[in-house]
């Protein structure tokens, strides 16, 4: 009995090195006797191994994704905080909203740093991290711009931020489907589509411009929550004579920061559209 490795993980020269005499292979307890013809050996062996690893994804040697490590736990905690941030902003509970937003911003830096420094980078992390960023940006932008809320962000800037993230989300869903179909033929189903741990198909590669854009968006949205909190606290005290002057200065700086953020958002969206290696197909 001879135990062989999957055909798709071997060199292309394997086709010419398959012996010209009968040999055997064991898959799931089934002994298969190969033909003498090398080409038939290659085709039969390829089909059997692909079928074996498609029906038993846990055996696939390329799965390197692990969900529960420290960086991914930080990312998941950021996702869990996101709906509460939006709720607190809408209900004018600005102190906990600012605290959770600051926590989310810090963990966004920490998870990537820990993953790179300690070799904990995973396929799941490359997908969950930008997903957490998009959820945080979309939720906070909506909460700060809807008419029923404080509406401190202009509609034009909110439309730019939301439009880019929605388009990226749609493209990510399409890329996930197409790469899953290529990597796991016949295994594209609802459960496998959302199971990025057992069925990883692509790795997200954000550009440096995208990282800077995320930074500016976090500073801009965090400043919006801070401005609302400042107006609320100072408005209640009404002890400072120059309150209105400081408020106008703060609002002016916030407006300029909004223009910068809108510019980087547009540039980042264009770079994603033109960049060919924003997503890497896993082999």
Swiss-Prot record:
pH influence on activity: Optimum pH is 9.
Consequences of knocking out this gene: Cardiolipin absent from cells. Decreases cell population growth during growth on the non-fermentable carbon source ethanol. Sensitive to thermal stress.
Taxonomic superkingdom: Eukaryota
Cofactor requirements of the protein: Mg(2+)
Temperature remarks: Optimum temperature is 45 degrees Celsius.
A Pfam family: CDP-OH_P_transf
Keyword tRNA processing: no
Cystine crosslinks: none
A biological-process GO annotation: intracellular monoatomic ion homeostasis
Segments crossing the lipid bilayer: 83-103, 155-175, 209-229
Stated name of the protein: Cardiolipin synthase (CMP-forming)
Gene label: CRD1
